[in-house]
Amino acid sequence: MKCPFCGHAATQVIDTRMSEEGDTVRRRRRCESCDRRFTTYERIELFFPAVVKKNGSRVDYDRNKVKDSMRLALRKRPVSAEAIDEAIARIEEKLLSHGEKEIGSDRIGELVMRELKRLDKIGYIRFASVYRSFEDVSEFRDMLDEFRQ
């Protein structure tokens, strides 16, 4: 690997460690020319399906959009950041396991709702009330009745 300090092509790996999650390899390297040390990280490159929005446009999957929407729904609720990250990991696992090149934003919304329902009932209701775009109180009441069953 090329040294970021002097540009020399020959570097030596002096230490390799696996992350706790097992998805990243951390390597300490030493340049054979300038003798400086640096760290590199090796991760699996995942290709998520393109997201097809309601208007038909396509955008890249964005983990941060999912995370932000879940955080908003769970604002001031007793749910840890770690629990949110684990829920997102389950959502992403489902997205990758289907092996499809495209997925509708509505499908992602349903996956988010399923995870929120497991994490926090109030967060689920908050998200569903925005996601489902209720027109009147009766639709909201129907959703609550469905939720109680």
UniProtKB/Swiss-Prot annotation:
Q: State where the unnamed zinc fingers lie.
A: 3-34
PROSITE patterns with a match to the protein in the record: ATP_CONE
Keyword entries, A-Z = ATP-binding, DNA-binding, Metal-binding, Nucleotide-binding, Repressor, Transcription, Transcription regulation, Zinc, Zinc-finger
Domain (ATP-cone) spans 49-139
Among InterPro entries, the record links this protein to: ATP-cone_dom, NrdR-like_N, RNR_NrdR-like
Disulfide bond entries: none
Q: How is the cofactor bound?
A: Binds 1 zinc ion.
Q: Which GO terms describe its molecular function?
A: ATP binding; DNA binding; zinc ion binding
Q: Which Gene Ontology terms describe the biological processes this protein takes part in?
A: negative regulation of DNA-templated transcription
User: Does the keyword field hold Metal-binding?
Assistant: yes
Fetch the Pfam families from UniProt.
Answer: ATP-cone (PF03477), Zn_ribbon_NrdR (PF22811)
Give the superkingdom in one word. Bacteria
Q: Which cofactor does it need?
A: Zn(2+)
The yes or no answer to whether the keyword ATP-binding is present is yes
PANTHER family given for it? Answer: TRANSCRIPTIONAL REPRESSOR NRDR
Q: Which family does it belong to?
A: Belongs to the NrdR family.
**NCBIfam families in the record:** transcriptional regulator NrdR
Protein function: Negatively regulates transcription of bacterial ribonucleotide reductase nrd genes and operons by binding to NrdR-boxes.
Q: What is this protein called?
A: Transcriptional repressor NrdR
User: What is the species of this protein?
Assistant: Ralstonia nicotianae (strain ATCC BAA-1114 / GMI1000) (Ralstonia solanacearum)
Q: Top-down, what is the taxonomic lineage of the species of origin?
A: Bacteria, Pseudomonadati, Pseudomonadota, Betaproteobacteria, Burkholderiales
